[in-house]
Design a protein with these regions (language model features):
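C-terminal-of-GTPase-core extension/linker across diverse P-loop GTPases
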Residues: 1-7, 118-324, 336
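Conserved G1/Walker A P-loop phosphate-binding module
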Residues: 1-83, 92, 99, 111-112, ...
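Amphipathic alpha-helical transducer elements in NTP-driven molecular machines
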Residues: 18-21, 31-40, 54-68, 92-95, ...
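Conserved nucleotide-binding/hydrolysis micro-motifs of P-loop NTPases
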Residues: 20-21, 45-47, 75-81, 88-90, ...
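Conserved metal-binding segment of the jelly-roll/cupin
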Residues: 42, 333-334
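Long, charged N-terminal accessory/stalk domains
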Residues: 57-163, 174, 208
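Short, surface-exposed secondary-structure boundary micro-motifs
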Residues: 75, 335-336
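Structural motif
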Residues: 326-331
Length: 337
């Protein structure tokens, strides 16, 4: 999974926290433990005028089209020592600035696609429908709307739309960046955070509160120091952990687990994935030669002291190709190629 992040640089590739891994690893004396990871693409170069070549410009915008979602960190704190580029604190203005740059970039993509499709439609009349949709979509964006709110009229339009990979079609998470003292009540008393929450509600996006300054401090600590730091701050989890959980919810992701002497590992899949496709995350041979999956829930495995104990109780199931893998399933795939 890859997320573009605006306003919180140097995050990079981060492990997905999952306490279940350590328990399974200890139970099976695994040589190594491998968490799932999320890659955050730093899009700090996204500034007013980027679509016209300012900042890192258009090449930069094209580079972030492959992200699955966008995380927009918006400033919700006052500090005279940290000057805002626009001279005042207004998170809704900042959101609009970024959205406009993404819209302008998407319009440019559509203009190129229209020119290409008009030519192709001369030879293939079926493509006239795409040209019509492209013009409707372009007009929609020119009115200041986001592509994700555009109404698609049929399956053909859905297929065409998915090919364009428009930035404004991607889901968004808003991270309200607050001062340290606003963390205690999760930003409830911060007027700017309230504005962001109200705005996000209108577009069915999620908002969480973060203090970037504290995140920078946490990033320099080892795991034990981090736990102590969070306890001292009376926080249950770091902002980065909040972000990871929000990302999983937004994209409908879950993790299944594999565990043995060699390694214990978490694998990220989309909710609703069937067993053969989940197996394919490990290796394409697993999907191609899938026979069955031996499955036990994490809870049943731990409660019965391990795989053998769970099997004796009849809690290890043999599942076929139609089985939908669940979050926390501990799976052993049987395959033959």
């Amino acid at each position: 999974m890859k997320l573009g992040i605006v306003g919180l640089p140097n995050v990079g590739v981060v492990p997905v926290p999952d306490e279940r891994l350590e328990v399974l690893s200890e139970m099976n004396h695994s040589a190594k433990t491998v968490p799932a990871v999320i890659e955050f693409v730093d899009i700090a170069g996204l500034v007013k005028g980027a679509s016209k070549g300012e900042g890192l410009g258009n090449q930069f915008l094209s580079n972030i089209r492959e992200v699955d979602a966008i995380v927009h960190v918006v400033r919700c704190f006052e500090d005279s020592n940290i000057v805002h580029v626009d001279g005042s604190i207004d998170p809704l203005r900042d959101i609009e600035t970024i959205n406009l740059e993404l819209i302008f970039s998407d319009i440019e993509i559509l203009e190129r696609r229209i020119a290409k499709s008009v030519k192709a439609a001369r030879a293939d009349k079926k493509l006239a429908g795409e040209v019509d949709m492209l013009n409707r979509l372009k007009g929609f964006l020119e009115e200041g709307h986001l592509a994700k709110n555009f109404e698609l009229e049929n399956e053909d339009e859905e297929a065409w739309f998915s090919e364009y990979n428009l930035l404004t079609s991607k889901p968004v998470i808003y991270a309200a960046n607050v001062a340290e003292e606003d963390l205690a009540d999760d930003g409830a008393s911060n007027e700017q955070v309230s504005k962001v929450r109200e705005f996000a509600k209108g577009e069915d996006s999620e908002v969480f509160v973060i203090c970037a300054q504290i995140e920078q401090e946490i990033a320099e600590l080892d795991e034990d120091e981090k736990k102590m730091f969070l306890e001292d701050m009376d926080l249950e989890e770091s902002g980065l952990e909040k972000l990871i959980k929000a990302s999983y919810r937004l994209l409908g992701l879950i993790s299944y687990l594999t565990s043995g002497e060699q390694e214990t590992k978490a694998w990220t899949i989309t909710r609703g994935t069937k067993a053969p496709q989940a197996a394919g995350k490990i290796h394409t041979d697993f999907e191609r030669g899938f026979i069955r999956a031996e499955v036990v829930s994490y809870e049943n495995l731990v409660e019965n002291g391990g795989y053998n104990g769970a099997k004796e109780k009849g809690l290890v199931r043999s599942e076929g190709k139609e089985y939908v893998v669940q979050d926390g399933d501990v799976v052993l795939f049987r395959f033959n190629v």
